[in-house]
């Protein structure tokens, strides 16, 4: 279980580094920069203590910034798809974290996982589902609904991770393993 945990931490940190590295070289529009600066004034006040009109203005600014920078969701989604779907398929069930920890993902019958299984796992386990959905919601919802949908989706993802961690501790197999009929095994070199 420790190998799996350290592999997952390594993978998520690496993906975050890749995403932020790519995003940092993409120039922001002037409008996005202005919105970001204005939003930072609210963040400095602590978003969770804002009330009334100030809170609504902060939500509107965050919504406007997300509309202005939806390309960032595309970058994040593409990196996650490559890292959590294509790389494990190419490396026969291993991400870089799993490779270094000498473990790999297989179907319950020990056969190699396919793209459908890897996609399903990535959508459930990495937040990819949310990253794909939010750019659509930002254009079909107003700021209020977008903010609430975002919070609900994030809470559901956190709940999924919590339930999965509890099941993993008790049963030595995570919720996503049960849902995708997969397991993690040690690799002998």
Residue ranges and their predicted role:
Residues 1-136, 140, 150-189:
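Short, small/hydrophobic-residue-rich motifs at membrane-helix boundaries and re-entrant hairpins
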Residues 142-146:
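Membrane-helix boundary connector in multi-pass membrane proteins
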């Amino acid at each position: 279980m420790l190998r799996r945990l350290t592999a997952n931490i390594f993978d998520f940190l690496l993906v975050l580094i890749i995403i932020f590295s790519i995003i940092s070289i993409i120039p922001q529009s002037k409008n996005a920069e202005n919105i970001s600066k204005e939003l930072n004034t609210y963040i400095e006040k602590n978003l969770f203590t804002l009330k009334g009109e100030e809170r609504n203005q902060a939500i509107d600014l965050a919504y406007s910034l997300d509309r202005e920078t939806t390309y960032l969701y595309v970058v994040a989604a593409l990196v996650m798809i490559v890292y959590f779907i294509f790389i494990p398929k190419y490396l026969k069930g291993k991400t870089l974290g799993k490779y270094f920890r000498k473990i790999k993902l297989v179907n319950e019958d020990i056969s190699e996982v396919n793209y459908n299984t890897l996609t399903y796992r990535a959508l459930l386990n990495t937040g990819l589902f949310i990253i794909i959905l939010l750019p659509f919601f930002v254009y079909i919802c107003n700021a209020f609904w977008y903010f609430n949908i975002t919070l609900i989706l994030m809470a559901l993802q956190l709940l999924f991770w919590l339930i999965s961690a509890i099941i993993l501790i008790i049963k030595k197999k995570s919720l996503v393993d049960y849902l995708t009929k997969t397991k993690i095994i040690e690799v002998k070199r």
